[in-house]
Structure formats: C-alpha cells, structure tokens
Amino acid sequence: MSGETFTITIDQRPVDVVAGETVLKAAARIGIKIPTLCYLEKCGPLNSCQVCLVKINGRLVPSCGTVSEPGMSVESESVEVHEARRTALELLFSDHVGDCLAPCNRLCPLRLNIPVMLRETEEGRIQQAISTVFETLPLPGVLGALCHHPCEQGCRRGQWDDPAAIRAIEKHLADEHRQSKTPYIPSRKPASGKSVVIVGAGPAGLSAAWSLLRQGHSVTVADRHSQAGGTLTSVPPRHLPEEVLAGETRQLASLGLQFRFGSELGRDLTLDGLLRGFDAVILAVGGVTPAEAQSYGLESSSAGIKAQAETFETSRKAVFACGRAVREMTQVLRAISDGQSAATCVNQFLMGSPIRKTPKPFSSIMGRVGRTELKLFLRSTSTSSSTTPCNPSAGLDRREASLESSRCLHCDCRSSGSCALQTYAQTYGVDASRFRSQRRNFEQQVQPGGVIFEPGKCILCGICVKLTEIAREPLGLAFIGRGFNVRVSAPFNRSIEDGLRQTAEECVKHCPTGALSWK
C-alpha cells in the first residue's frame, strides 16, 4: 500500500525504502552512485542504455526502472555487474561517430588542450590562452621554439590544405607572456612538507621540477654547469634565443625552485648524502654509461640507469631516473614529457599512494574523415589558407595568431570533460573498438539558433524526446524509423531547432553524450 516501508540490502548494506521506490533511488540515499545515461528524474525511467545494471536474485536488471521489493538483495559493485556495464557501454560505442578529444590533443604527450587554446587566441582572449598553456606545459617558450609538433601531423585541417600552425601560435603566446609586465604564475598546491632534489637541469629535470613545485613540494635542482638548460644551452640562438631559456628559468624561480650549480653526482654529490637531506631524488643527468650508473650505486642497463618503464623507479628506494639517463632521447618534447611523467610517480611516492602510470584520458576515435565530411567541419571555420607572418624571424603577431587560430576545425567534442558517456568509459575501462563495425558517415547539423546536433553521438536515450513532450513543445522531437534505422529527429522532416523552440537549453544541458550542444 502507499507509504509502506520495508528494508532491502544493497551491497550487503541495509536501506529502508518506501513502496514504489526504485533501486536506483534507494542506492543513492546511502551514497552508492550507480551510473546512468538515460535517467533524468523529471523524465522517469526510460530503460534504454542498460548502464545502470545491478544484479538481483541472479538476474541483471536496470536499476532505474526496477521497483524495490521486501527482502530484495542487490549487488551493484560486483565484478559481474561491472563487466555487464562495461559491455553495455562498449555496445553504445559500436555505433558512435565522433572524437572525444581532437587528434591534435590526443597526440600531444603533454595533453595540452590545443582546441581550447586556439579558440581563445582566435577570440583575442590572450590571457586565457596563456593560462591554458602555462597551466599545462612545463617549458612553453622552449616548446614553442623546438617542439617537433606531432599535433600538427594529426591536425585534420591538413587533410584539406595545411594544418593549423599550432607550434607557431604557442610560441606567440609564450612571447606575449615573456614580454608582459605581469607574468602569469601557474597555480600551486599548499606546501606538502616534502622535499625533492633533481640532479640535472636539462629539459627533463626542469620539467620534473615544474610539476613537483606545483604539487606543493620543495624542489632543488643540482647541476654540474653554471646555468640551467642542459643540452638546451647548446642550441643556436636563431632556434632558441637566450632570453627564452632565461625566461623559463625565471618562471621556475617564481614557483620557488632552488638551484645548486657546480654540483656533480659522483664528485660533489652522493645518493647517500642526497637521501639524508631530501625525501626523494630524481636523476635527470643526461646520457650516462652503464659503468657510471653502477658507480652511483644503481643497477644499470645498456642505455644507462636501469629504471622501471612506467614508474621510473631505480634499484634504490626513493631514487627515480628519467630522460636520457634511462633511454636514448633526441626530441625535446619527449624529454619534457618524460620529466613530467616521472614527477607524477614521485608525487605518488611522496604522498604514500601506489606508484602507477597516469592513464590517458579516454577518447572515442573517429579516424580519418573523407572530403565530404571535412566540408561539414569547414562550414563553421575560416577557409583561408595558412597565415604567413609579416616578420618571419619574430613569428606571428596577435592579429596573425588570431587568423591562424580561426582555421581550427573544432573537431573536438564540445562536451568533452562533461560528457557522461566519456566519464563512464574512463571509469569502466571501455574498449571502444570491441564491437566496432564499419563507421557510418559523420553528420553535423548546425542550427541557426546555435544548437548543433550530431546524430552519430546520439545513443537514443530518449531524454530529449521526453523533455519536449513534458514541455508540450508544439512540434517536439520523436523517434523516427524502425529497428537499426531508428533516429531522433523532429517530425515531418522539420529541423531539430523547430522541435526545440522552448526546450533547447534544457535538452542540451541534459544530453548525456554531446549529441546536442551549443555552437
């Protein structure tokens, strides 16, 4: 009867429920978050995505539409349930057409959000663009000068004419920052009370220092030379001006980095002595021989110091190694990335956490697109060819950087970072290609009012259809077709915008996949 209460158990935890209450709601009341893609309380259970599966009495059922019953025993976090949810997600990706991350972003080992940087530069929001760069890149001036820019190799604009000049734009932002009277200082966590010494002031060592300083640790860099930079100091000034490297050193000093020059490992420094004064040691000493590695008291490999590939740990506790001290490395970007990755592992060690490689952010990958599909991207971007700077030696000025940035195709998902499908794919370790068949064509419907509909990202959850029904939209949205050809659209071959006269904002807000977004 209405109002009757009884007890069920969820993951062996008792919870009192009211008759008619779903398992999903009961779980939420005791802090158990069951993933959902097709559930919005206002719409009620739609039972379409199957991501909210739980196990009850030996059966897998959707928790959003399963009503609690007296004595019910629910499993929501078992291995079997997790595997079922992962399979449900992988089935949704079997017909998913779109990238979570743009190819340029995926190919950057430092994970710079390049599309955001380009949009900010295009719109003249230079301080925001500088913030985007300086919150992500350890040595942006050096990278603007010397990066081998794998991002540009993956830029889809290059399939049409020329890729966006990403490195040149990054260089422009670094130059703007260096010339600013109020330089941007990256955010930093409160002091941790932990200290690290890095032996080697080359690109890997300086990158590791930048990352650890931002985690709140005290960092000292020791180097046998009289200035920071390592191999960077031998780069001809026409490729890396001295003021660029000096600016990077000042930036690190503003974060609190201490330098100890004229100190060489094996001559002035020993690991025993360093470990007495610091909580962890990173060796970024450049190329070393196996004999030199052994003289430090460490196991060696054919390349130098023997270190675990994913954790950078050496044979001695609290001693880590990265860069050319561990493996042959000729590209500055790789050395900087290596230092940053090593710093992540050292931070885990200092915080007492398990030391493991940072997982890459999940991204569905659409792959190479055809010319017809490229034209869809080009509709909302500049069709100009690549920008040639008026002063090639100085690089792009602000106007030229904006023009070049406007050539970005915006092929990243507008909902990346806030997309529930992407979030759960990361959480459950989804293999997006497990059930992948031949990809259907990419579609993008740009509406005059600013709504963008990408049918290839729609999972037919039904939320937008239900919201337009609840709001009594004059036209609304509906499921059109049958079987595998079902799609969401406005009736009578009208546009999506016609169906969202009153509910566009609400439908975009609650779309779980980015199929509906704002331009």
Can you describe what each PLM-predicted range is?
Residues 2-195, 247, 280-321, 325-510, ...:
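Ferredoxin-type iron-sulfur electron-transfer modules and their immediate structural context
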Residues 43-44, 228-229, 267-269, 484:
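Short secondary-structure capping/turn micro-motifs that flank functional sites
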Residues 112-115, 121, 159, 163-167, ...:
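Beta1-alpha1 glycine-rich phosphate/pyrophosphate-binding loop at the start
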Residues 209-210, 271, 332:
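Generic hydrophobic/aromatic pocket-lining and core-packing "Φ" positions
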Residues 209, 274, 282:
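Cys-dependent condensing catalytic cores that perform Claisen condensation/acyl-transfer
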Residues 30, 215, 255, 274-277, ...:
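Conserved dinucleotide-binding and phosphotransfer motif residues
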Residues 88, 251-277, 393, 397:
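A structured beta-alpha segment of the ubiquitous adenosine-cofactor-binding alpha/beta core
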Residues 260-262, 480, 519:
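Solvent-exposed beta-strand sheet faces enriched in polar/charged residues
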